[in-house]
């Protein structure tokens, strides 16, 4: 699996760059699927279809992934107090039940401790040529994106213990 992932990422850098960013084509993943696990987040093709109000498209895409990856597909949910998380979780639960796809917990970590949030925001502003004080700058991150302990994650998903169990199993 790891070798396939490195090949896919390398192909993205060599053959798939758009405006200096590597773009990975879906069929490259399908071609190198052996040993690879798929996690559907809100940014995945399935997640985007779910959030844009196209459940039939989401169902169809999920079935395509399941055809190739079988029991190596999961929904990955997070609770970082950001836009659309609750909607995605609701839809992931629906699809998990309908298609027997396990749900795991993740945290989209961007910094080590909660205290590092402001420094992270400063780095983002520098990278985007913005200033922290600008009230109109995008706020794409939250202070919840620090590396949480197992106890913190268990507490965060205490209403969904199966999600924690699935995460540990994975």
PLM feature segments, named:
Residues 1-170:
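Phosphodiester-processing cores and adjacent nucleic acid-binding clamps
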């Amino acid at each position: 699996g790891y070798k396939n992932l490195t090949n896919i990422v390398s192909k993205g850098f060599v053959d798939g760059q758009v405006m200096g960013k590597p773009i990975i084509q879906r069929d490259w993943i399908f071609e190198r699927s052996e040993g690879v696990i798929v996690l559907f987040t809100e940014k995945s093709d399935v997640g985007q279809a779910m959030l844009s109000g196209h459940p039939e498209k989401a169902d169809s895409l999920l079935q395509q992934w399941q055809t190739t990856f079988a029991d190596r597909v999961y929904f990955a949910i997070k609770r970082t107090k950001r836009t659309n998380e609750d909607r995605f979780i609701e839809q992931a639960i629906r699809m998990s039940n309908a298609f027997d796809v396990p749900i795991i917990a993740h945290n989209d970590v961007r910094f080590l401790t909660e205290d590092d949030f402001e420094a992270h925001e400063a780095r983002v502003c520098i990278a985007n040529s913005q200033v922290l004080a600008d009230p109109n700058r995008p706020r794409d991150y939250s202070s919840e994106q620090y590396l949480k302990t197992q106890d913190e994650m268990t507490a965060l998903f205490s209403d969904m213990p199966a999600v924690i169990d699935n995460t540990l199993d994975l």
